[in-house]
């Protein structure tokens, strides 16, 4: 083996070892300093009716309160509570402690106790002097344990390794961004996504994730009889967001769901029918089917279904970056949008839509920018088919296929091929659009009132809403423009659209100081060597198509999810704008705003900033304590 190659391998091995060692060092010294370095360990167990632990000066009991007075301020890392209660119980406790300046403070903390888990854990991390626990009526305190010990948090440890690895790559692997932007971006998404899936485990924090999981699970049986069990029923009802908020409770819930997966097993008949939107669940259903085939535990089966979505997103964005003819940084940046990476780790049909809309636009761009070539017509044909298949999940996006009407004429062999191609575009456009429009027209013709609203409830009715729009068209147009304009900025460039993690949380507005310059900089600023500017006719056509898609999005949600005659359009979410980001950026492309920086710096900024925002969201939302 060549000595230079051997040196490179040795260098990477040393870097990996140092990364792992540094992560362990930060975990032990940074997050376990009081217990690991200073040796401040404690384990105080109090059980009503039992002996008072020697660390306590006194225990005061009054009605539904228990007050524990410690002999001296004691560092307590966590509290474990066991209650005797038949149902979920919200409890609170007051902690009197010394802060870092040895000043006495009083803090109220509330938490939820789930009897299914058998224990409740709360992070304290304080020098406790007095702890007062309030137990609601109907619940009985079995025991309370205050303890502090050196414990490695596997989620935080992996998180630290991931962050250190990213820093190493960004500052030492400039050539990766120049020569292999597609591989680098795909690798970053895969690492971040896998960590998200692993750290979240069995929880439904995505948008309507319980509905999407149910459909994917049913599809995994191929229709007809579906095997049911207690865990499946719990997931379909949606697990509460506060099922757990510590790593210990997460492990208890995972074990509980794994056990219940084999409890009350039975079969149920479900008639899924024919629904084009189900194409968005095929890979997730395949993952669940594979999990059952290999008899995986439920938590692994659940995560495998999510992993299928993530792999589709990674592979799709990899090829979108590779095929992008100019300014590949644009696709890499959009692929790394924190909200979309998070969505790719949940049960949803948004991922196929987003991936195929992106690929369709890139193939169309390749044709109009590169002109006539041997593969131009293949790219264009691929764009049509990809647009068509991708929009089956949400037909309101199918007008994006209309960009294929606007292509250079020289790419066609003759007029016959051109006519056939435009006929194909029209056929796909009409066929997919009818999956959305035709049912509405049929419901209206059959006067199906009271059966076409939101199944979750509310004064909604598609037929009555459609008739309301037709009766008051000017009022609806005014409402439409008011709603679109009021939400335009936050949906396209705010944390709601770019840095939101479902039920977990949305990054605070202070991150907008980084997010907004990043998205606008990526849009308007280019390097002279890689500037992407389309002809005005293409920009105009894209603008018209974007307006049509916006109209369909807002109108579809007004029909389905807004009360009849409402002066507000309900149901529209910022994530629905993601497939429109690339077309909007292309419209705003220009030759005047030129950056004089190297390609490696530009690409590291484009990919590094959204990665940093995603990591910030992870640290605040996931199990770092």
Describe each region flagged by the PLM:
Residues 221-304:
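Interfacial juxtamembrane loops and adjacent helix segments
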Residues 363-372, 398-430:
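Perimembrane helix-loop-helix junctions
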């Amino acid at each position: 083996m060549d000595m230079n190659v051997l040196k490179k391998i040795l260098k990477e091995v040393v870097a990996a070892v140092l990364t792992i060692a540094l992560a362990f060092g930060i975990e032990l010294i940074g997050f376990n300093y009081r217990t690991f370095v200073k040796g401040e360990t404690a384990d105080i167990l109090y059980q009503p009716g039992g002996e008072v632990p020697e660390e306590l000066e006194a225990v005061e009991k009054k009605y539904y309160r228990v007050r524990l007075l410690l002999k001296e301020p004691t560092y307590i890392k966590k509290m474990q509570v066991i209650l005797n209660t038949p149902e979920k119980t919200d409890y609170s406790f007051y902690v009197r402690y010394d802060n870092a300046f040895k000043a006495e403070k009083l803090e109220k903390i509330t938490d939820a106790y789930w009897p299914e888990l058998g224990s409740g854990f709360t992070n304290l991390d304080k020098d406790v002097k007095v702890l007062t626990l309030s137990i609601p009526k109907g619940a009985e305190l079995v025991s309370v344990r205050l303890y502090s010990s050196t414990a490695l948090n596997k989620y935080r440890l992996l998180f630290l390794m991931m962050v250190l690895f990213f820093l190493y790559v960004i500052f030492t692997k400039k050539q990766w961004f120049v020569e292999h932007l597609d591989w680098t971006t795909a690798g970053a998404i895969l690492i971040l996504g896998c960590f998200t899936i692993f750290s979240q485990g069995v929880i439904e924090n995505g948008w309507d994730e319980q509905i999407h999981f149910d459909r994917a699970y049913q599809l995994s049986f191929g229709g007809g009889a579906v095997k049911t069990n207690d865990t499946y029923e719990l997931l379909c009802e949606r697990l509460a967001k506060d099922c757990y908020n510590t790593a210990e409770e997460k492990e208890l819930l995972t074990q509980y769901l794994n056990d219940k997966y084999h409890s009350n097993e039975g079969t149920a008949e479900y008639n899924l029918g024919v629904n084009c939107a189900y194409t968005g669940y095929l890979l997730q259903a395949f993952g669940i089917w594979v999990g059952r085939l290999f008899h995986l535990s439920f938590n692994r089966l659940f995560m495998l279904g999510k992993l299928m979505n993530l792999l589709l997103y990674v592979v799709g964005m990899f090829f979108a970056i590779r095929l992008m003819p100019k300014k590949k940084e644009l696709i890499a940046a959009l692929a790394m949008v924190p909200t979309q990476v998070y969505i790719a780790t949940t049960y949803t049909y948004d991922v196929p839509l987003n991936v195929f809309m992106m690929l369709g636009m890139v193939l169309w761009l390749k044709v109009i920018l590169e002109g006539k070539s041997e593969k131009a017509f293949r790219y264009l044909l691929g764009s049509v088919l990809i647009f068509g298949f991708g929009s089956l999940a949400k037909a309101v996006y199918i007008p994006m296929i209309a960009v294929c009407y606007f292509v250079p004429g020289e790419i066609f062999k003759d007029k016959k091929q051109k006519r056939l191609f435009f006929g194909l575009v029209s056929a796909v456009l009409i066929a997919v659009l009818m999956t959305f429009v035709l049912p509405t027209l049929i419901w209206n013709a059959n006067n199906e009132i009271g059966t076409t609203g939101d199944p979750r409830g509310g004064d909604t009715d598609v037929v009555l809403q459609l008739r309301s729009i037709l009766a008051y068209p000017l009022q609806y147009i005014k409402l439409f423009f008011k709603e679109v304009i009021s939400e335009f900025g936050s949906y396209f460039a705010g944390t709601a659209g770019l840095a939101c993690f479902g039920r977990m949380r949305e990054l605070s507005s202070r991150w907008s100081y980084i997010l907004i310059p990043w998205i606008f900089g990526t849009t308007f600023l280019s390097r002279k060597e890689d500037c992407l500017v389309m002809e005005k006719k293409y920009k105009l056509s894209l603008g018209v198509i974007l307006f049509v898609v916006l109209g369909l999005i807002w109108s579809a949600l007004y029909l389905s999810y807004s009360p009849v005659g409402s002066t507000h359009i309900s149901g529209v979410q910022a994530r629905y704008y993601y497939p429109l980001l690339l077309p909007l950026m292309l419209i705003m492309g220009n030759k005047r705003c030129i950056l004089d920086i190297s390609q490696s710096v530009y690409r590291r900024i484009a990919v590094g900033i959204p990665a940093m925002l995603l990591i910030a969201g992870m640290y605040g939302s996931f199990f770092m304590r």
